[in-house]
Amino acid sequence: MPNLPACGTIGGDEGSSYGGAPDSVGRRKNMRKLTFGLCFGNRGFMPGELILGAREDMVKAVTEAGYDYIMMEESATRYGAVETRSEGLLYHDWLKAHEGQYDGVIFCQPIFVDENGAAAALQDAGVPILMQAYPDEIGKMDFANRRDAYCGKFSVTDVFTQYQIPFTVMKPHVVHPLSPRFAENLRDFAAICRVVNGMKRFNLGCIGARTTAFKTVRFDEIALQKYGITVESFDLSELFQMVAALKDDDEKVLAKIRRLEDYTDFSIVPQPNKITLAKIGCVLDWYIQEYRLDALALRCWNEMETYLRVCPCVLLSELNDRGIPASCEIDICSAITMRAMWLASEKPATVLDWNNNYGDDEDKVVLFHCGPVAQSLMAGKGKVTEHKMFAKGDPGSGWGCNEGRIAAFPMTFSNCQTKDGKIIVYASEGAFTQDEIEDGYFGCAGVAQIPDLQNKLIKLARGGFKHHTSVGMGHMKEVLTEAFTIYLGYDVVDIDN
């Protein structure tokens, strides 16, 4: 029997490339502010004095948005900017010396900058790069003040494309760092950085084998490894053995019971089933710590119900609420998109079935699962019940569904598959509504309104995507698409057009 961690004290962060350490109940949180490396371009015959103002503007913009920064000293080059190839290499080496201290780079173009120094500076940045160019001002278009960054930005992006240096461009084409539009750009770029840095290398736990009935959740483990996703696979019998070895009065088990009772309503769950759920929760925490898992998928039926007399939905719900994406039914691919959305939004994600029509409204759908939805995505506190599907044929075997309703909020839905060695993914947006679902509908569900839903469903069906979709809070399609295509190399299927 391994030495299991105390309840909630899971490690996690050491194994991921990104994600944060747990708090007192194991919620993932960032250990430091997201940090940008600031880089400034120059060109000899342009008004270089404008760069000094840009340094001040950019520092103010970044810090007021709540982020941190690193910046090469002003004395290192003329105005602390890069123009020549040698200056670019100087910045390159400075950035290399600070590797691990920055999450993305903002390349600031106060004027029509020299693209050669820029390419030398950032060709090995290894993180997302945001292209920012200053606008010109009416009334300040004389030679001493004209910037021409509108044009110069194309020279930089042209050469970066030739060098195959990935970069991000946003609307508007030119934008002042102290404007509200750039504050929005910064927020989205920070989300892109979190997704890219968190997805390019991480560990994903596969606890149990795929049940043969669920061929819909097949995946290619070697394809995932090509994208930096390591799958750690465990037999369910090992989990059963560790659960059996735990004593009912073990302090770790008692602490987990307290945590679960505080998390949701356990008032009707028989004590033996509650204890078993707590033991499984302790074992899942051990897997997360021991193998430094950043996300997991669990074989949730029907062995746990038959032999342990529980349904682990509420445990997945609690893990998701902690920022540890946890998918049911060994749906590894859903766990991948759940992690991406958690990184983008910094809020829990969940996996749901495309389950029911909602009356005659063709743009509405009931999204449902038995109970793995994070409590923070629900309209009110859930209630742990017996899974009605299992109770029908084997009463007393399905305790563990966290039942309730999903709150109304803007949402993004996304999922992926592996095919021919590639990760193929889609992302789109909609909203959960306040439409009621009748009381007799079991599990955790919500009504989603999705524009042009019927055409999107046809594209999902033709594309071979599964009956699951991952859902996250907020609209983040553009952030995910940028991260997936420009930096991570996923193949994105556009279901919106």
What is the role of each PLM region?
Residues 11, 15-30:
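Short, Lys/Arg-enriched N-terminal segments with co-localized hydrophobic residues
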Residues 38, 191-219, 363-386:
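Conserved anion/nucleotide-ligand pocket segment
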Residues 157-173:
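Conserved thiamine diphosphate
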Residues 256-257, 263-344:
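Long, internal scaffold/assembly segments composed of regular secondary structure
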Residues 323-436:
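C-terminal catalytic subdomain
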Residues 394-497:
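Extended hydrophobic packing segments that form well-structured cores
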